Design a protein with these regions (language model features):
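Soluble catalytic regions of membrane-associated enzymes that act on cell-envelope
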Residues: 1-164, 168-193
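Generic structural signal of hydrophobic/aromatic residues within well-ordered alpha-helices
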Residues: 7, 114, 118, 131-132, ...
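Terminal, low-structured helical/coil segments at or just beyond the last alpha-helical repeat
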Residues: 166-170, 190, 230-287
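Generic structural motif recognizing short loop/turn segments at the entrances and edges of beta-strands
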Residues: 176, 216, 268-270
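Intrinsically disordered, low-complexity segments enriched in Gly and acidic/Ser/Thr residues
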Residues: 193-241
Length: 287
């Protein structure tokens, strides 16, 4: 994948950029690598590497919709796209997306307004005509509506500062939403929130991982070290013997201040992130 290759090249140069990190983590997810390679690169930005908190930044407004569209959280994707159109004008990409989002949100007449604008353009008339065929179908190929069957709470005010509660909500409403699960796990790990990570690890049972990703095992073991046996058993999970041996090796190097070897052997682990990289310090959040 070109996006993954290009963002890797940038990150490997030692530079830090929120937009690059945002697209890099999206690329990791879409190639099935997010739980396995999240810590292969120094996540110096913490949770800001996953998404853009809403802060009325014109450049961010242009790209903020991608994660929400991929999650199937179309209302939020639409909000970002509308704000982007206000900032950047009625450009074809924004009009296309707003038409698509309004179709799946069952607002055909609103979608038609955007389609009619597109039909006036030389290069996007064909796209507009294709979307026009979808107007009353209420669906667009390749676009999922994660909360479509949620009739009890159809209206929801999104948390525009912190995506964590939104990811939790999506997981609870649709236990098959793998992206929501992996992003929730990443969000909780990057924010040092190990207790909530373990509380939500139950969702992993809805997906077919060959085995629990190493970073998840590493976080689970940190949790195990901080609670009594009875509390840990309530999690319903076990830590592999290999993970425990690796931690003993990690702790031995750490205790003996063999920092170069520690980084060489464990620089891509959650333990190393928590000790040396997390922008929130090395303390575990327990609530």
């Amino acid at each position: 994948p070109i996006l993954l290759t290009q963002t890797e090249k940038y990150i490997n140069s030692g530079r830090t950029n929120q937009l690059i990190s945002y697209f890099h983590n999206l690329a990791l997810y879409h190639t099935g690598k997010l739980p396995y390679q999240l810590f292969d690169y120094p996540q110096k930005l913490g949770v800001k590497a996953l998404y853009f908190p809403w802060n009325s930044d014109s450049r961010e407004s242009e790209y903020g919709h991608f994660i929400y569209e991929d999650l199937g959280y179309i209302n939020e994707a639409q909000r970002w796209e509308f704000e982007a159109m206000v900032v950047w004008g009625e450009t074809a990409p924004h009009l296309l997306n707003l038409a698509r989002y309004n179709i799946v949100n069952k607002r055909p007449e609103v979608a038609r307004r955007f389609i009619n604008l597109l039909k006036q353009s030389l290069f996007y008339r064909g796209d507009a005509e294709e979307l026009e065929k979808q107007l009353h179908a209420g669906s667009v190929p390749g676009l999922r509506m994660a909360l479509e069957n949620n009739k009890e709470h159809p209206a929801r005010f999104a948390n525009v500062i912190n995506i964590g509660p939104e990811l939790q909500y999506l997981c609870e409403q649709d236990t098959t939403n793998r992206m929501a699960f992996e992003y929730l796990m990443s969000d909780l790990l990057l924010s040092n929130n190990i207790v909530r990570f373990v509380d939500n690890l139950k969702f992993i049972r809805h997906f077919k991982y060959p085995e629990m990703p190493p970073a998840y095992q590493e976080a689970l073991y940190i949790y195990k070290l901080g609670v009594d046996g009875e509390t840990f058993s309530k999690s319903g999970f076990n830590v592999s013997e290999n993970t425990e041996k690796r931690f003993q090796r990690y702790y031995s190097l750490y205790k003996n201040r063999q920092m170069q070897r520690l980084k060489a052997e464990f620089g891509n682990t959650y333990w190393y992130y928590l000790n040396f990289i997390s922008p929130y310090g090395d303390k575990i959040i327990r609530n």
